Amino acid sequence: MITRKTLSLNFLKPVLELEYQIDQLSKMTYKNKSLNIHDLTALKKQLIKIKIEIFQSLTPLQRLHLVRQVDRPTTLDYIGHILDDWIELHGDRGGTDDPALIGGLGKINNRTVVCIGHQRGKDTKDNVLRNFGMASPGGYRKALRLMKHANRFNFPILTFIDTPGAWAGVDAERLGQGEAIAVNLREMFSFNVPIICTIIGEGGSGGALGIGVGDKVLMLEDAVYTVATPEACAAILWKDSKQSLEAAEALKITSYDLKALGIIDDIVEEPLGGSQEDSLLASHILHSKLVTELNYLLSLSSDKLKELRIPKIRRMGTFYEG
């Protein structure tokens, strides 16, 4: 049985109830071999059927709640499964080392890459340390330092996006949060090396964009990407955060909506039940996709990369008025 680290979401309760029944019956079958194994098999088939029904009909808001669960794989979880010889690098060379945005060197298929990503915590204490994945200006400047390092030594860049947004405190504004993100956007347009950005959880506003300019933008199936959280959007437009369900629908935050709109390039399939169900399988699928995309981008010249990158990102700002 899967151990849930947090209280389950309401829409997952049928799954939890069946998992509990399967767990109890498995223990009984182990102790008493004469018990009918067919009952256990039937329950497992029923569990798969229920999961398919639930996860094929998730609302945008349910997907958002799903990716906010603490048992969902983080950047460091994916790095541990995807990269070899990982070495984390620290500091922005300006006096700070933000734990909410991590980066370093590693190898994927024997090719050295620079990997950068938002890092959420696994529990309350860790989340406080990581500021819930909300990076400070120093975090974005650290990311820029590492990306410049990658550009200098011709290392491809991989970024993993998972943040509710950039840190919005008074100190963040005082230290130049907007400027730090804007400089990252400008510089990422100019790099000569391939850049692949993957939204692994919550892609929130400018905090996501600060490491989100890429030649390929991938998105995990259940991840979300939005200019503002549905709660914030509802509070702004309707003065009522309870309207977040309608806001989530209108914002088009899911991978399928964003693929149709041309905001992302491709959707990375997740295991049934989400990446938190099987982080190893989720990492294997993502690894395979990253290798495929990286091999393609490495076949292009640096001039061609930039020629394609700039209009691709600029098209994201296109909209139509009804």
UniProtKB/Swiss-Prot annotation:
Listed Pfam families: ACCA
Keyword Lipid biosynthesis among record annotations: yes
Primary localization class, coarse: plastid
Disulfide partners: none
Pathway stated in the Swiss-Prot or TrEMBL entry: Lipid metabolism; malonyl-CoA biosynthesis; malonyl-CoA from acetyl-CoA: step 1/1
Enzyme class: transferase
GO biological process: fatty acid biosynthetic process; malonyl-CoA biosynthetic process
EC number: 2.1.3.15
InterPro entries: Acetyl_CoA_COase_a_su, ClpP/crotonase-like_dom_sf, COA_CT_C
Molecular-function GO terms, alphabetical: acetyl-CoA carboxylase activity; ATP binding; carboxyl- or carbamoyltransferase activity
Domain CoA carboxyltransferase C-terminal: 39-296
GO cellular component: acetyl-CoA carboxylase complex; chloroplast
Keyword Nuclease set for record: no
Compartments (UniProt record): Plastid, Chloroplast
Alphabetized UniProt keyword annotations: ATP-binding, Chloroplast, Fatty acid biosynthesis, Fatty acid metabolism, Lipid biosynthesis, Lipid metabolism, Nucleotide-binding, Plastid, Transferase
Known catalytic reactions: N(6)-carboxybiotinyl-L-lysyl-[protein] + acetyl-CoA = N(6)-biotinyl-L-lysyl-[protein] + malonyl-CoA
Entry function: Component of the acetyl coenzyme A carboxylase (ACC) complex. First, biotin carboxylase catalyzes the carboxylation of biotin on its carrier protein (BCCP) and then the CO(2) group is transferred by the carboxyltransferase to acetyl-CoA to form malonyl-CoA.
Family indicated by similarity: Belongs to the AccA family.
Xref: PANTHER family: ACETYL-COENZYME A CARBOXYLASE CARBOXYL TRANSFERASE SUBUNIT ALPHA, ACETYL-COENZYME A CARBOXYLASE CARBOXYL TRANSFERASE SUBUNIT ALPHA, CHLOROPLASTIC
Subunit relationships: Acetyl-CoA carboxylase is a heterohexamer composed of biotin carboxyl carrier protein (accB), biotin carboxylase (accC) and two subunits each of ACCase subunit alpha (accA) and ACCase subunit beta (accD).
Official protein name in the record: Acetyl-coenzyme A carboxylase carboxyl transferase subunit alpha
Organism from which the protein derives: Antithamnion sp.
Underlying gene: accA
